[in-house]
Amino acid sequence: MKKIVRRILIVIPAAALQVLWLLLLVKWLAPYTALITLTMSVAAFFFVLYIIIKREERTYKILWLLVILTFPLPGALFYLFFGNKRTAKPLGKRLEKVKEAGTPKPLCIGAVPFDGGHRMEQTLRWLERKTGYPLMRAGQVRYYALGDDMMPDMLEDIKRARSFVYLEYFIIEPGRLWDSMAAVLEDKAAQGLDIRVMYDDLGSISTFNMDNVRQLRSKGIKCVPFNPLIAVKGTVNYRDHRKMLIVDGETAYSGGVNLADRYANIEQPYGHWKDTGFRVTGEPAQSFTHMFLTFWNAFSLQNNLPQPELKEPRLPAPEIENGYILSYYDSPLNREASSNQLYIDLLSQSTDYAWFFTPYLMPGDELLDAMACAAHRGVDVRIIMPGIPDKKLIFRMSRSFYQALLTEGVKIYEYTPGFVHAKSFVSDDVVGTIGTVNLDYRSLFLHFENNSLFYRSNIIAELKDDFLSTQAKCRQVQPYDIKHYAVRWIVDGILRIFAPLC
């Protein structure tokens, strides 16, 4: 809260000065109104052309075209600061500068027995090439159907750490969970281990302030915020939504769980909190180590610290033991959103079923079309959503997409005990994903995310069983639940236009 108050005290005087300056400017420029109007119209015309030519999702384009055509000058300025990905170029330069060092080398995908045919091989080759991260043997993988089960194991692995512990989370919030974890981290730092914590400045704006950071640093823990929130630099977008814990480069945790009490159902402000996650050991942890170090070196002033050695993964054995995993991070700086395209591709390959967990449902048109096409082919497409929302407006926006999906044969379920925060996908008993990617525009196109694709791993059966178990506690949304009133139809249309901003 102190962090928010401090920033408000800075922003309000600055905004007041800007308003005063604009009033004086308007008075001075009054005689030139006609010329200014013409100039603004010409500028708006070129902005519209620029947006039309840009390679972006069409829903996003339509939103900004409406804003700029309705309010030419403020709309154009708003787009430059909040809608234009060029503001993220400094982030991209910092990341590219450090990414080349220590990248895990890709495996020989040709050695993987693709019983599903050539198409899955193409998908994995594309994902390797697109993200720069390798397909690896999954080895020992543990699935977590709740954060309640995941947190104790995380603490135990931290206690067993011998060399380093790295944490990167969107939200860190002091409470029973974080306080117990921080105590263990402080003890490990006192033993001389390399402890690093990275958190997103916007995601933790109301929960984790500089006092918390100074407390960690005073105990020997290195702690940095990702992309500090500075409105004039357009950093509201391009947040670090990734979630990972790496211990000694040998064990890694990821999934939807942040470091706050509600994620382990210690507190239940939105009913029962349903999440998913996993633990991997051995070679797959190397990808997470590299993902963390890439961001740490790009955004920490301490990037001259010695880095742990990344081991080159061995080629997979010809026979499948526990399948394969490909862990990667997605970036808003990419021309093609990796996770969005991956889900479109996997939906096109599905023959039996394709099931999603997601807390928010505001996908782009291409992903909506892919879901509809799969349902038309007879694929059982299901989506589990929250029954109790954490953000009512976002939930209302998500529901505005229900009708379009239900009429195409997609089944939607709402989790009546509480809130679903899981971000997972499973299809045909063959492939699944677990990560941080929500099915909304911000997550698919504007945030840094991490995701893990599992192929023919035992975790897929566990994910499927968990989906069915969760579905049994859900209410299925029926077409008659979505009233076709004219007012609702208009409201839904407006909400869908503005969905990319939420």
Regions found by a protein language model. Give the residues of each.
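Short, solvent-exposed amphipathic alpha-helical segments in soluble enzyme
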Residues: T294, A370-A374, S400
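N-terminal localization/anchoring segments of enzymes in phospholipid and broader phosphate metabolism
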Residues: M1-N340, D345, Q349, P389, ...
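Helical hairpin unit composed of two closely spaced alpha helices linked by a short loop
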Residues: Y360-R382, P386, K391
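Catalytic-core elements of nucleic-acid end-processing and repair enzymes
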Residues: K423
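NAD(P)-dependent dehydrogenases' Rossmann-like dinucleotide-binding region
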Residues: T351, F356-L361
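Histidine/acidic-residue-rich catalytic or RNA/ligand-binding cores of hydrolases
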Residues: E366-L368, F395-M397, V426-S427
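Thr-Gly-centered strand-to-loop micro-motif
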Residues: F357-T358, M385, Y415, I434-G435
